[in-house]
């Protein structure tokens, strides 16, 4: 059934989803703050999708606009496809225009992003009866070669989602099964937070790439992963699963979770990353000043620290990576601390109830 879909954010992922949904026959509108980007999409009339996507070709976009109200008005599904550092700011802009019955998808939700987003909507007076849906990752590994043309390196066969609170999971699953059949709805946003694998393979391994970056050595981020980087990622992954266990959740290790998303072989993080053909050609950064630290430390690893604090457990490797990152980039955002999320005095039991409804 055709849906009226709004995409907030016209970066790599936003353009990919806009073209993908349009090619499936949905009415798609897309928002971005960049007038240059919006003009280019309007001039083209849509987005071209190439590569390893289940659908390829030119997807016609109904509207591209820098005006939030024009894009989300009347939409059934609103996909927020932006780095998590911008989710709160977008929530502020969206709050006056959201409408009863809409599904707002944090796509993806960095750990505990739904708490921050809902707090923002409340702060800015949103009274619309909406439902928040969170995904753990994007459907695609993709890059926009230029505005209006996206190359998809790989498309996942399955990935997790939930509503916030998760008591609306069954209803949402019915709505989304025809739009994103790859989604499976799971326990709650604690699980979705911990399913965010970027926190495992971005900050720690990026710190270990400092020598490459500062020596201007070109490298492919995943294909050139080293065994040492893999060991740090494995240690971070064990602490991620430890947090899940503290909340009574059965969290799959990185390798099993990754294999559920991609058809890939391997027994270690090092193996599965290097064996994923969809990652070929994805070059690594040449600076520490990138989202792999700017976003994934304060908005993912710090959120893991918050979950660990609520659960009353220690996560020394995660703490160490956060500390080193803050020494490398002195002006990192404070991030999703218990204080910033309004969770300072919340018990583990109260937080679980908040997440499940």
Question: What does each model-identified segment do?
Answer:
Residues 1-51:
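NAD(P)+-binding Rossmann beta1-loop-alpha1 motif at the extreme N-terminus of oxidoreductases
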Residues 84-148:
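Rossmann-like NAD(P)(H) cofactor-binding subdomain of soluble oxidoreductases
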């Amino acid at each position: 059934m055709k849906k009226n879909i709004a995409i907030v954010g016209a970066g790599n992922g936003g353009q990919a989803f806009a073209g993908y949904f349009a090619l499936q026959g949905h009415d798609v509108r897309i928002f971005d703050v960049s007038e240059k980007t919006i003009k280019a999409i309007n001039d083209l009339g849509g987005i071209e999708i190439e590569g390893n996507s289940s659908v390829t070709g030119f997807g016609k976009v109904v509207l591209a606009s820098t005006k939030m109200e024009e894009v989300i008005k009347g939409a059934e599904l609103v996909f927020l496809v932006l780095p998590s550092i911008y989710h709160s700011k977008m929530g502020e802009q969206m709050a006056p225009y959201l409408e009863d019955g809409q599904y707002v998808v944090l796509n993806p939700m960095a750990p505990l992003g739904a708490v921050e987003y809902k707090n923002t909507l409340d702060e800015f007076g949103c009274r619309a009866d909406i439902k928040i849906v969170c995904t753990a990752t994007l459907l695609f590994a993709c890059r926009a070669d230029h505005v209006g043309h996206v190359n998809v390196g790989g498309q996942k066969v399955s990935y997790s989602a939930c509503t916030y609170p998760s008591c609306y999971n069954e209803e949402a699953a019915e709505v989304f099964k025809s739009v994103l059949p790859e989604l499976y709805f799971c326990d709650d946003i604690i699980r979705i937070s911990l399913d965010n694998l970027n926190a495992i393979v971005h900050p720690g391994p990026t710190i270990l790439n400092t020598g490459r970056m500062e020596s201007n050595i070109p490298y492919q981020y995943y294909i050139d992963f080293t065994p040492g980087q893999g060991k740090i990622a494995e240690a971070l992954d064990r602490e991620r699963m430890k947090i899940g266990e503290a909340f009574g959740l059965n969290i799959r290790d990185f390798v099993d979770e990754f294999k559920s998303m991609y058809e890939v072989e391997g027994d270690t993080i090092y193996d599965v990353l290097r064996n994923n053909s969809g990652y070929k050609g994805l070059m690594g950064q040449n600076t520490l000043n990138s989202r792999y630290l700017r976003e994934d430390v304060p908005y993912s690893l710090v959120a893991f620290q918050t979950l660990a604090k609520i659960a009353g457990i220690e996560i020394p490797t995660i703490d160490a990576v956060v500390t080193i990152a803050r020494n490398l980039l002195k002006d990192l955002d404070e991030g999703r601390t218990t204080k910033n999320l309004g969770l300072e005095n919340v018990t583990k039991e109260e937080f679980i109830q908040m997440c499940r409804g």
